[in-house]
């Protein structure tokens, strides 16, 4: 009767050994950026049978969120997974922070969607734009709750990538970002 079960039902059988490729140049121990979750680390390259087909997977660990994510190696590029930004991109992002904030006169709900899209794009310069636009100096009026939430998400993403790139801890990276913002 078991032979009539659908193929997707888990079976206790040994998976054949498969050579695991290193597409996109990611290796175990590398820091990577996954657009919706930020900076994570490749902790394992895994081969699994799912729905009757074999998949090679990157196993990513996001310490801040205490989350593990498995990404098929053939889908990594399509979902926007990338290596940490280059030094030139980091310099451009820090320069963006020094720029004048763009105050848009559109409804907050529309701006909030735009800011969320920029944060989830994973692009360091776009995230820096959100931080710059939502940053409030001490002499400026306070932010609304939702504005503060988006600002915290953006500065957190920026700080995590900066910390991974410069091999410093996240609070030190956040302090560096805040110093750049105050100097602007």
Region locations from a protein language model:
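Broad gene-expression machinery/nucleic-acid interaction feature
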Residues: 37, 55-57, 68
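Charge/polar-rich, low-complexity and marginally structured segments
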Residues: 74, 78-184
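Short, solvent-exposed secondary-structure boundary/capping segments
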Residues: 48-59
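Mixed-charge, Lys/Arg-rich low-complexity intrinsically disordered regions
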Residues: 2-28
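Short, well-ordered turn and helix-capping elements at secondary-structure junctions
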Residues: 30, 44-46
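Conserved hydrophobic positions within beta-strands
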Residues: 40-42
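A short macromolecule-binding patch
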Residues: 59-61, 65-74
